[in-house]
Amino acid sequence: NLYQFKNMIEEAATGT
C-alpha cells in the first residue's frame, strides 16, 4: 500500500 510506504518513510524521517 502506498500509504503504508509513505508512513514508513515519514517515520524514518522523524528518526533523523
From Swiss-Prot:
Q: Which residues form a coiled coil?
A: none
- Tell me the cofactor note: Binds 1 Ca(2+) ion.
Question: EC number(s)?
Answer: 3.1.1.4
- What UniProt keywords apply to this chain's record, in alphabetical order? Calcium, Hydrolase, Lipid degradation, Lipid metabolism, Metal-binding, Secreted, Toxin
Q: Which reaction does it catalyse?
A: a 1,2-diacyl-sn-glycero-3-phosphocholine + H2O = a 1-acyl-sn-glycero-3-phosphocholine + a fatty acid + H(+)
GO terms (BP aspect): lipid catabolic process
Q: Which GO terms describe its molecular function?
A: metal ion binding; phospholipase A2 activity; toxin activity
Q: Name one GO cellular component term.
A: extracellular region
* Tissue expression summary: Expressed by the venom gland.
Localization, per the record, is:
Secreted
Co-factor requirement: Ca(2+)
- Protein family per UniProt: Belongs to the phospholipase A2 family. Group I subfamily.
What else is on record for this protein?
A: Is not lethal to mice up to 4.7 mg/kg by intraperitoneal injection.
The entry's function note states: PLA2 catalyzes the calcium-dependent hydrolysis of the 2-acyl groups in 3-sn-phosphoglycerides. Cytotoxic in Ehrlich ascites carcinoma model in mice and towards human cancer cell line U937 (IC(50)=610 ug/ml). Acts through apoptosis, modulation of PI3K/AKT, MAPKinase pathway and cell cycle regulation.
Question: What protein is this chain from?
Answer: Phospholipase A2 BF-CT1
Native source species: Bungarus fasciatus (Banded krait)
